[in-house]
């Protein structure tokens, strides 16, 4: 489990080392990542046992033919796939060392300091969702809504955001981008692990807002597309706020892998876009940001409304639960009512067309609530900007006033000095 964890850290480090000439990241790539890759080769037999086991979930839960499933866990295919990954993990550090002439400066204390800052942060950020359960078990401490663990997570979430901001705010833009990419790639990896750790079905598709955010956040950082970012930062913060207020938990032990998925995903979906704003990677949210968000959410809502209705109709027609969808929690009454009991009355207002079921009042309310909260959040951002600008102006005015006062004092001192000199000159002349 620890080796798989470290290999996930390589997944974050190596792409960043290619596109950023950051010495700390490249030092991790040519040392830590090479060591991990060699260890993976040495443990190939154990890897192959895991890859080809029919006892796991993930690939074995796919609704595909037995022949195709057998191909996916075929030892020869998995060995080739493993070899491709290993070659890539070794090729990148070799190219960095030879073509880029990158070598670790072992005599440089700053090099070591930055290395031991970067390495633990990368390892901690990239922890797979299943590793805590593997190492410690689920534990007897239950993570449930409004429990002390729930509030501890909220505290750590905002504490981590503050620590990252104050820890890196004075660093260069390159370092800030490296931090954001480490978090974004870790988020992407941790979400995709759900397909292997749990199952791959319609519910697991990245069409819930926070699941989609795992991809859009990375895309916005790569493309620097302001419209994608505007949509992502507002709508995903709204999504996380809803998740914090009404967490979708299963009442299992704290380290249960779905709990880890829930915590890791919603933490990074909030932290990465907010940090990007605070670091100045993207400009302030202007009047067009709300427009981009509302247009983007409307397109998203209509898309998941159509897809959710279609998939649930297929599930009803075939009797196969794998096709059930519950995007925005507005399709499956049992799940939504368990989380929010008063929605039962809204689900009771429905009609059918063939196998498709529609809940018009509930679905319109969901749309309206998201739009309202997005608007409120946007104006909260604007209010924060206004308060910050007033503080900056006040400090600037105070500094200017102090400079003027210092200048006046200097002039007065010069004047007094001049008068003293004149008096001394007069006294000397009188004595003569």
Q: Which ranges hold each PLM region?
A:
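Alpha-helical transmembrane segments and their cytosolic membrane-interface
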Residues: 108-192
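Hydrophobic cores of alpha-helical transmembrane segments in multi-pass inner/ER membrane proteins
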Residues: 6-15, 78-97, 152-164, 211-221, ...
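A conserved mid-domain beta-alpha-beta active-site/ligand-binding segment of alpha/beta enzyme cores
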Residues: 274-315, 347
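Membrane-interface transmembrane-helix boundary segments in multi-pass integral membrane proteins
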Residues: 66-87, 140-154, 290-294, 314-377
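Membrane-interfacial loop-to-transmembrane alpha-helix junctions, especially the N-terminal start
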Residues: 23-33, 111-115, 171-183, 227-233, ...
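Membrane-interface helix caps and helix-loop-helix hairpins in membrane proteins
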Residues: 195-204, 223-226, 248-260
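Aromatic-anchored segments of alpha-helical transmembrane domains
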Residues: 35-45, 122-130, 185-194, 236-248, ...
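Membrane-interfacial, low-structure loops and terminal tails that flank and connect transmembrane helices
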Residues: 99-114, 392-412
């Amino acid at each position: 489990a620890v080796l798989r964890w470290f290999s996930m850290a390589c997944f974050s480090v190596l792409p960043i080392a290619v596109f950023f000439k950051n010495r700390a990241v490249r030092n991790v790539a040519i040392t830590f990542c090479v060591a991990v890759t060699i260890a993976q080769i040495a443990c190939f037999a154990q890897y192959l046992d895991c890859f080809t086991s029919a006892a796991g979930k993930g690939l074995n839960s796919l609704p595909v033919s037995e022949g195709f499933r057998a191909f996916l866990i075929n030892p020869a295919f998995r060995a080739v796939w493993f070899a491709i990954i290993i070659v890539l993990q070794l090729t990148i550090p070799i190219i960095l060392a030879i073509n880029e002439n990158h070598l670790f400066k072992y005599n440089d204390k700053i090099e070591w300091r930055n290395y031991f800052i970067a390495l633990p942060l990368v390892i901690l950020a990239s922890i797979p969702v299943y590793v805590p359960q593997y190492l410690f078990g689920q534990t007897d401490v239950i993570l449930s809504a409004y429990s002390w663990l729930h509030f501890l997570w909220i505290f750590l979430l905002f504490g981590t955001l503050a620590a990252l901001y104050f820890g890196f705010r004075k660093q260069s833009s390159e370092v800030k981008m490296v931090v954001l990419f480490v978090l974004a790639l870790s988020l992407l990896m941790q979400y995709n692990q759900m397909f292997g750790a749990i199952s791959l079905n319609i519910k697991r598709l990245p069409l819930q807002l926070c699941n989609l955010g795992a991809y859009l956040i990375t895309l916005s950082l790569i493309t620097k597309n302001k419209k994608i970012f505007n949509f992502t930062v507002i709508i995903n913060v709204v999504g996380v706020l809803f998740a914090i207020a009404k967490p979708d938990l299963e009442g299992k032990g704290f380290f249960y892998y779905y709990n880890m998925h829930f915590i890791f995903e919603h933490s990074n979906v909030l932290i990465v876009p907010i940090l990007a704003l605070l670091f100045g990677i993207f400009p302030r949210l202007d009047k067009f940001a709300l427009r981009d968000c509302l247009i983007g959410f409307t397109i998203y809502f209509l898309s998941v409304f159509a897809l959710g209705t279609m998939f649930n109709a297929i599930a009803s027609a075939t009797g196969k639960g794998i096709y059930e969808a519950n995007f925005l929690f507005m399709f499956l009454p049992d799940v939504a009512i368990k989380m929010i009991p008063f929605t039962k009355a809204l689900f009771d207002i429905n009609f059918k067309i063939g196998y498709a079921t529609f809940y018009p009042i509930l679905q319109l309310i969901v749309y309206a609530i998201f739009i309202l909260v997005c608007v409120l959040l946007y104006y909260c951002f604007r209010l924060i900007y206004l308060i910050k600008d007033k503080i900056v102006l006040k400090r600037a005015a105070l500094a200017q006033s102090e400079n003027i006062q210092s200048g006046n004092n200097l002039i007065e001192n010069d004047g007094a000095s001049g008068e003293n000199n004149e008096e001394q000159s007069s006294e000397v002349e009188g004595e003569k």
